[in-house]
Amino acid sequence: MSLRVPPRWVFAAPASAFLAAISLAGCVESTSEIAPGVDSAQFVRREDANMAGATMAIISIEGAPQELSGQFRQSLDKAAAERQIAVAPPASAQYLIRGYLNASPVENGARVDFVWDVFTPDKRRVQRLTDAMLVQGAGDDAWAMVNDAALNGIAAKCADDLAAYLSNTPEAAPAAALSYAQ
């Protein structure tokens, strides 16, 4: 009696399924406690940071309907100023930011996910920040649930995330930390 060896694809299929499940595991988050994504390190804003040292320019924000995009950008600019984030023209900024927003309906409202890719001027991505907020409401159109108050809250959370990251960059090191080098 001879033993038949199964084809190689029999072993490859479960391995591929396992790898796909592992790579998607970071995409599943609970709506009751929204945790940061796998690629997003948790940063705590340094209170002693020199925020003027880490300049940024927002290059683009994609995903929101056009009528909300302008409002969101204004809210984000205001929230960034309140957090002393130094905004500069793209040609002179130390960090270039690309944002992505996505809203999807969930039970009792909408979930708005946001992703910020942080690049150096030579277009090398140095960080991806991900976060999400829940918006209360009803209906099938998740973006229709995002009112002015929700939009301002999302912009404030985005500014908090960006400020926390930027405050931990070398350019934002407090002056006292740099005095030893002089």
Question: What are these model-predicted stretches?
Answer:
Residues 52-54, 81-83, 93-97, 110-114, ...:
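Envelope-exposed proteins and targeting segments
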Residues 105-138:
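Amphipathic beta-strand/beta-sheet edge segments enriched in Tyr/Trp
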Residues 87-105:
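A short, hydrophobic beta-strand-centered structural micro-motif
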